[in-house]
Amino acid sequence: MSKQQAQFTNPETPGYVGFANLPNQVHRKSVRKGFEFTLMVVGESGLGKSTLINSLFLTDLYPERVVPGAADKIERTVDIEASTVEIEERGVKLRLTVVDTPGYGDAMNCVDCFKPIISYVDNQFERYLHDESGLNRRHIVDNRVHCCFYFISPFGHGLKPLDVEFMKALHNKVNIVPVIAKADTLTLRERERLKRRVLDEIEEHGIKIYQLPDAESDEDEDFKEQTRLLKASIPFTVVGSNQLIEAKGKKVRGRLYPWGVVEVENTEHNDFLKLRTMLITHMQDLQEVTQDLHYENFRSERLKKGVTSSKVEHVEVTKDQILQEKEAELRRMQEMITRMQAQMQIQGQSGDAQHL
């Protein structure tokens, strides 16, 4: 048997076809292509949203942000700010988009303050549907919101009416993960009491938050235990900080108080590591739920309405426009085929002339 032939045979395992290598192929292709993920953060100002996001991904997404004064907040409207950063770790690339909502809950009158957020989420679904309906679908950018961290104030006794209204308005569109901010302002007993109160009110109002899937029966025991702990930690109580301080002879990220140090990455102090673990280990599931549940619900509703018209960033997209775009793409493809045929004819004629 030749050396070249031996490369394509496997005498040691008769009957082996090679399908077992398919996951490796998918893995290599995914690593080359990279991953896309969009995270939305919503909550009142002063709850440490920006600090937490920077702590989670060890980057500064808001280097030029200006914090508004108290007078500016009285009539402030909700802005939508999307920041995209390319993160690479051990050869794996992640295109992370963080959608912030400065101004949410800040104004004296917060009625309908979450409507711009709903419009943004719907616009991303609409854009994806429009791109998916085109002929060139190879390079569709997925800007749909895959997860929403909803920040709850630790200074109340549970959910505010605005919290309930927002989550009920968004829970059928986005995977909502409730987060109790500034956990260092609460004692351990207060923390557990607030967690139970928030969960009870979420159930009472019929709010659907993101449910972590159960671990498969063939998963190892460590992963099963990790999944159980993550589920038991919802809503996550977190502390964020980008400052390095010295504690017990080592540098840690945390906050220094007269009574001691709160370490960001210490599970005994807060749920920061659990939140990050949940996001990283369930990133694929968050994307799948977005695709299979939230986007499909949106798409079904659009199809029922006949996709008569909609707005994608204030640009009207109608059936006629979609048909025109498809016709234009078909014309371009036909022109390309015609040019290729003409070139082949010229080459064929020149070849015949040489033989003569």
Curated annotation (Swiss-Prot):
Residues 181-184 are annotated as: G4 motif. Belongs to the TRAFAC class TrmE-Era-EngA-EngB-Septin-like GTPase superfamily. Septin GTPase family. Residues 43-50 are annotated as: G1 motif. Septins polymerize into heterooligomeric protein complexes that form filaments, and associate with cellular membranes, actin filaments and microtubules. GTPase activity is required for filament formation. Can form heterooligomers with other family members and form filaments. Interacts with wdpcp. Residues 259-269 are annotated as: Important for dimerization. The keyword GTP-binding applies. Residues 100-103 are annotated as: G3 motif. Residues 33-305 form the Septin-type G domain. Keywords: Cell cycle, Cell division, Cell membrane, Cell projection, Cytoplasm, Cytoskeleton, GTP-binding, Membrane, Mitosis, Nucleotide-binding. This is Septin-2A. Filament-forming cytoskeletal GTPase. Required for normal organization of the actin cytoskeleton. Plays a role in the biogenesis of polarized columnar-shaped epithelium. Required for the progression through mitosis through regulation of chromosome congression. During anaphase, may be required for chromosome segregation and spindle elongation. Probably plays a role in ciliogenesis and collective cell movements including convergent extension during gastrulation. The record marks 155 as: Important for dimerization. GO terms for cellular component: cell division site; ciliary membrane; cleavage furrow; cytoplasm; microtubule cytoskeleton; midbody; septin complex; septin ring. InterPro entries: G_SEPTIN_dom (IPR030379), P-loop_NTPase (IPR027417), Septin (IPR016491), Septin2 (IPR008113). Its main location: cytoplasm. GTP binds at residues 43-50, 77, 103, 182-190, 240, 255. CDD domains: CDC_Septin. PANTHER family: SEPTIN (PTHR18884). GO terms for molecular function: GTP binding; GTPase activity; molecular adaptor activity. Disulfide bonds: none annotated. Pfam families: Septin. One of its GO terms (biological process) is smoothened signaling pathway. It is found in: Cytoplasm; Cytoplasm, Cytoskeleton; Cytoplasm, Cytoskeleton, Spindle; Cleavage furrow. The gene is sept2-a.
